[in-house]
Amino acid sequence: MRIILQRVNESRVEVAGQIIGRIEKGLNLLVGITPSDTDQEVAWMARKCLELRIFPDQSGKLSQSVQDIEGGLLVISQFTLYGDCRKGRRPSFDKAAPGAMAEQIYEQFVTKLRASGLQVETGQFGAMMNVYIENDGPVTLILEREAESER
């Protein structure tokens, strides 16, 4: 599982010109899924996203999590995070999970985040989306967790 995590002042996602998800201060999560991802990876990634201390306290020190600030999370599925560009001029997406499998794992991830009680908004799985992100910082991190069988 691979996530591009961005600290945002606000973020929204549109499908066919309609806003389907919007948050203010919080995290924008672009989520890539592989066929080997299991419940363990989903739980680890959800916990990591909720608990990472990347928001500043009053002194400016990065000591608060999205839970601490009661921020929102906008979660967007993005299979292109597993694009392999080493050969040729067109990326290969062979390492990305097939659609139905990826959607099931994505929904498990969203469910784990929602269990936190925070506002969790999503894109539309498999749709062409316009994602608007106002970065804060910018603070952008790449989170990766391979299944134990892949380590």
From Swiss-Prot:
Compartment(s): Cytoplasm
Keywords annotated in UniProt? Cytoplasm, Hydrolase, RNA-binding, tRNA-binding
Name one cellular component (GO) term.
Answer: cytoplasm
Q: Which Pfam families match?
A: Tyr_Deacylase (PF02580)
Which InterPro entries does the protein's record reference?
Answer: Daa-tRNA_deacyls_DTD, DTD-like_sf
One example of a Gene Ontology biological process annotation: D-amino acid catabolic process
EC number(s): the record gives: 3.1.1.96
Q: Catalysed reaction per UniProt?
A: glycyl-tRNA(Ala) + H2O = tRNA(Ala) + glycine + H(+); a D-aminoacyl-tRNA + H2O = a tRNA + a D-alpha-amino acid + H(+)
**Positions of short motif Gly-cisPro motif, important for rejection of L-amino acids:** 137-138
Which GO molecular function terms does the record list?
D-tyrosyl-tRNA(Tyr) deacylase activity; Gly-tRNA(Ala) deacylase activity; Ser(Gly)-tRNA(Ala) hydrolase activity; tRNA binding
Q: What is its main location?
A: cytoplasm
Q: What does this protein do?
A: An aminoacyl-tRNA editing enzyme that deacylates mischarged D-aminoacyl-tRNAs. Also deacylates mischarged glycyl-tRNA(Ala), protecting cells against glycine mischarging by AlaRS. Acts via tRNA-based rather than protein-based catalysis; rejects L-amino acids rather than detecting D-amino acids in the active site. By recycling D-aminoacyl-tRNA to D-amino acids and free tRNA molecules, this enzyme counteracts the toxicity associated with the formation of D-aminoacyl-tRNA entities in vivo and helps enforce protein L-homochirality.
Extract the NCBIfam families matched here. D-aminoacyl-tRNA deacylase
Domain comment in the entry: A Gly-cisPro motif from one monomer fits into the active site of the other monomer to allow specific chiral rejection of L-amino acids.
The UniProt subunit note reads as follows: Homodimer.
Q: Which HAMAP family match?
A: Deacylase_Dtd
Please state which protein family the record places this protein in.
Belongs to the DTD family.
Query: Protein name, please?
Result: D-aminoacyl-tRNA deacylase
Instruction: Give the originating organism.
Output: Acaryochloris marina (strain MBIC 11017)
Gene name for this UniProt entry: dtd
